[in-house]
Amino acid sequence: NDGWNFWDYSGVTVINIVVDHPLYYNQFLKALPEHYRQVNIDHMHIDYMKRFFPDVDVYFIPSAGTELNKHRKLIKDYDYLPMCQRPIDVIFTGNYTPKHILRKQLNNMEQDYIDFYESALERLIMSPDLTIDELSEMCLKQEFPEITDEQLANCMPPMMYVDLSVRFHYRQLVIRMLADSGIKLNTYGSGYNYIECNHPENIIMHGGVNSQKCLDMISQSKISLNVMPWFKNGIHDRIFNSCLNGAVSLSDSSIYIDELFTDRQNIIL
C-alpha cells in the first residue's frame, strides 16, 4: 500500500504465466513490478493486453503438458500403459461449478446490472463463436455508444461471471450428453453432484484431487475429454496431458488447436 515493491527492491525480473483471461487480473495490471514479463496462453489474450495494457511486455506460450509413465513416476523409465491395459474408458479432469453458485457474484448488484450480465450470458450461449472480448465490447457499446477503451477495460472484470458461466454451461452439456447416452464418465474434480441429467449413475465421481493424481488417472484412461474454457486461439493443458500420457484426446477446437492437430489423426474434435 505504501508503494514499496519487493521485486523492484531486489532487482528481480518477474515472469507471470497467466492461464486465465487477463480480465481476471485487471486490478493488478495497473501496479506492476518494473521488470515484469507476462506470458499468456491464448493469442487473443495477447491482443487484449496489447490493446488495453500496451506498456506490459507480453508473450505467447501454450500451456504445457506433463508426461508420466507405466509406473506413474515423473521420471520417465517405462512406456505408458497400452490401451488394452487401461481400466478407465473415459475421463474428465477439472471442476464443475453450477450457475446458482456463480450467480452469487451478482447478489449485491442492482437489478439493471444483473439483467445486463444475464443478457450477455444468454447472448454468448447463443453465439459460441464470440470471444468474451467481442461480446463485452458489443454489449457495452450497445448501452454506452461513446465508451472509451479505458472505460471498456474498467468494465471488463465483472464479465468474469459470464466467462465462467458459459464455460460451465457447455461443460455440463457435454457431460450430460455422454451420461445420458449410456457412456460412463470418470470425473476427477469437485462439483459433479450438481450436474443435471437423466442418468447420473453414469457419472462416476472421484472428487477433488491434485494435479499429479489427474495425470496418474489420465495415464490409465483410454479417452480423455476436454471442454475448452473459452480459449478461441489457444489450448488447454488437458490436451497435452492426454497426448503425453497415451490417452486419446477428445475435445472441441480452437484456431490454435486446428493449427497443431489433424482431426481423426492425432486428436478427435
Set out the residue ranges of the language-model regions.
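Glycosyltransferases and closely related glycan-assembly transferases
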Residues: D2-V14, D180
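Alpha-helix-centered segments that form part of catalytic cores
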Residues: M138-S181
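Catalytic core of nucleotide-activated saccharide and alditol-phosphate transferases
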Residues: G11-F144
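Catalytic binding pocket for nucleotide-activated donors in carbohydrate/polymer assembly enzymes
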Residues: A31-P33, D47-V56, S165, S190-L269
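Short beta-strand segments
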Residues: G94, N186-G189
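Short acidic active-site motifs
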Residues: G3, Q27, Q212-K213
